[in-house]
Amino acid sequence: MSTAAILPFPPLPALAWDADEPVPSAGTLMPTLADGVLLERVARGDADAFTVLYRRFERPVFGMLLRLAGGRRALAEEWLQEAFTRVWLGAGTHDPSRGEVRPWIYKIALNTARSEMARKRFRMPHVSLDEAGLDLPDERAGEKRVAAHLDEARRATAVAEALQRLPDFMREVIVLRCSRELSFAEIAEVTGAPQGTLKSRFHRAVASLREALGPEAGKAR
């Protein structure tokens, strides 16, 4: 059992975009340490190393979880907490010879989402503009700017809803490939599926999204 497994889990810092005070970035904390070195320190119970590792991955991992949660921020934050609890407790189990730290963390986060969705018999809801994580401009903004922002928000919501209608195995590969920009080799590490299968799923998912979105497909980013 790793040392970290018997130590109390350190409190996660506030999400960087929610914190009242500026939060030191990974670049100002242990800037020269690679992910693998940080994880080794985490395995020995180093809470500072854990904070740096968390800061490096919180945004992209949260973004992935938010999309898998259908835009439900509170749920994605809950999954993020659980995922990094597992990172802390399982730091000593990572085998550098079998893969890098990044896909290992994504795998933990994805498995967290999968298990939580299965446990709660999760069903994707209708995605509102707010749930899609879209900030509307201030009422005092110009009329054209507001209209343009709303148009963009509606397109993003249409994409989010189309994404949630995909089967889980298609949605996962789309989110990991397009939103998080992982290679198919990394996605294979995360999901456990062969690269050829993942590429097939990806192309089928893209075709399904284009069909579902119709004219919006060319506008959506």
For the regions a protein language model found, what residue spans apply to each?
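Hydrophobic/aromatic residues within well-ordered alpha-helical segments
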Residues: L53-F57, V61, W79, A109, ...
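Amphipathic, Lys/Arg- and hydrophobic-enriched alpha-helical face
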Residues: Y54-R73, L89-G90, L163, A212-P215
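Structural recognition of an alpha-helix C-terminal capping motif at a helix-to-coil junction
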Residues: E78-T85, G99-N111
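Arg/Lys-rich amphipathic alpha helix in sigma70-family domain 2
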Residues: L89-P96, K107-S128, E152
